[in-house]
Amino acid sequence: LDVYSRKVVGWAMDTNMRTELILEALEMAITQRRPRNVIHHSDRGCQYTSYAFGKRCREAGIMPSMGSVGDAYDNAMAESFFATLEREVLNRRRFKSQAEARMAIFEWIEGWYNPHRRHSGLGYRSPVNYERSHWRSRARMAELLPPAAPDSLSGKISKAA
């Protein structure tokens, strides 16, 4: 879950909570975001304290961060997301199979939550729309900045004053 936009960027499902499952979700997030110097916050589950998870984070330039034991408020955004998933998807119907449940969750995340579900903390915009407006304003800001010019002494490019 991207803290800035509330967008689900990496997720995986299975009948267990093995480290491999967590690594699968992490790989999805890395592929989507190509992060550098970001923080991955989680609880202190054994999957997140595993050597394999820590190693993959280091390889990707991600700094692991973990909350204190037994404190749901330490990762309130993730807790809120899962409560919303339960309320809006899982508690509304009985699934005939795990495959049906997986498809419902996939459709909810990729077809509803990320592109359309509005969040008060995002000015009542969806995660996708919030990110779009962020990138648009960055592009506008770049247009307003003066062009980069070579520094006459070092040959390096610096921002013109």
Annotate each PLM feature:
Residues 1-161:
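Charged DNA-binding/catalytic regions of mobile-element recombinases
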